[in-house]
Amino acid sequence: MALIQTSLIWVAYAVAVAILFLIASTFVYVYQKPRDRAAAVTIVCIFTTLALLATVLLIPVDVALVSSTSRSSLGRKKDWATPDKVDSIVYTLRIVYYTLYSLDAVLCLLVIPFTYFWYEEYDQDAAEHGEQTAAQRIGGALKWTLGFLIFVVAIFLVGFFVPFAKQAKEDKRLDLDYFKHLLSENHGERALSFGLGFLITVGTVLFVLYTGAGMALLPVAMIKSAPSVSAPTLAANTASQLETNRERQRQLEGRNEGREGGLDSRDRRELEALVREERTLIRRERLAAESSGEDRHWIVKAWIKTEAFFRPLKLIGGLILLVFALVIFASMLITGIDKAKNSICGAHCGYILGHINIFQPLNWVLVKSAKVFPIDYVLFLLLVLFLFSASVVGIATAGIRFLWVTIFKIRKGQTSPQALLMATVLLTLITLAINYSVAMVVAPQYATWGPQTYCDMKTNSLDEQPDCAEHKDLIKPCSELATNPAAQQVCTPSVLSTFINRVTINFPFFGIVLFWAQFAFLGVYLIVFLTTLFKAPTLDQEQIDRDLEEEEDEGLLASTGRRFGAAWSDVTGRATKPANYGATERDERIQ
């Protein structure tokens, strides 16, 4: 029975990873620029996105496996859950966590930088003339990657050793053996804890800025946005206008053919205006083709059809996401206040909370649903995907910046390979921060103990399990503050919570920064949310979809189609009756 239950949990995780693969592929194909697509960049971005999402979605598996060793209805261990069996489950989870975290670090710090520099090293002219070989390109990429890696390792070593250097100097132990001992302590777990804490802290800064803004923008943008004219109708109207424009140009040129001095001033001005309009219409024609998925990957076409089909439900979906975002905001605020007020050790250990003192809605829902796996897994998947989508929206809105300078812009169908790689790095770091935030702030009881309970009765011996079958009122949720020895025998904390607590206890600075950054996240969310309520959202997703050129005239891309008509045209791929918008009365008379 235990093997079947454990196997089902891992099967559910495998199914979730398969779903994540589709989501990661869709994300990459929707945002990348088709004309600049590179197979290596696409594969690296998809695999990295899959790995980082799989890391976060290991939390419900962790909770389900450690919780499967006990009966929450009786507050006691199951008969098969011997200490050796429990240790085996925890050891397996620890290996999976180490593997995924190491994979995320290698992808973020080694593979993506190499791919970025490899793409940057490409010189089309030199390659066409045989002056640049694959070996030269790889050598240049390796050189830059090695330099970047040395820089990162230097920061890591300085950050790791400096806090201990002062104490070692006072104790007169400032030698090489002492620092070797620090690195190898607990088989290197202390060094790994520092590395994980460092990456989470960097990711938290991005989490505050991008995810905080994106969580406010995403629902409001969905509510306020209206679908533009459908892509098929836009293409049909543009073709009609383009034909009229060119016919008028031919008439002007034919009327003045052979005329001494060429066109008169009035006709010349009109012809120049027609030429400018023709260029704009050609851009719009190409834009309509790309928006409808022409010559795009089948994943992009499927995404466009799905988006168009559900477009009329955007308002309802936006309202649901708005409520969900507010619940997350309230849950994080409640936990933050609870930790600041009732933490068992305060800043010395990163504000670890012994047990929930204030009712927290999201944590309560996840704990209750965890009793029937995989309901909690589905809810947790939706939570993670919402925060991930909010991060994408935040990055798409602000772009990739250094201070006030925009380095890259992230747009659907218009993102360069370099920008896509940089965005993937940011999302990797943000996802590590989401890992901390979900486990320690959004749902701390769920992520630490799940639905585990213990029987708070005294027993005659330490090896005997108390029986609360007749005393249900003595069954209590597992807590770090439990004093009954039975709690230590029954309650098994999740592996992730152990990792994070080790980081915040060994390196209190990380714990302080990570905890107070959650309030900064709430502040950014509140500011952006209130701003978008009284002002048009800065992110217009439909406009971004159609913004092919920076100099595109805004008037030519106005939303003129009907809401449901545009959606149905995009689904069927057929245009409604073309409208002669943009044509002048004079053009109509000439026709």
Swiss-Prot record:
GO molecular function, one term: cobalamin binding
Pfam families membership: LMBR1
Subcellular location: Lysosome membrane
Role, per record: Probable lysosomal cobalamin transporter. Required to export cobalamin from lysosomes allowing its conversion to cofactors.
Annotated segments matching region Disordered: 238-266
Membrane topology: Multi-pass membrane protein
Covalent S-S links between cysteines: none
Protein name per UniProt: Probable lysosomal cobalamin transporter
Family to which this protein belongs: Belongs to the LIMR family. LMBRD1 subfamily.
Species of the source: Pyrenophora tritici-repentis (strain Pt-1C-BFP)
UniProt entry tagged with the keyword Iron-sulfur: no
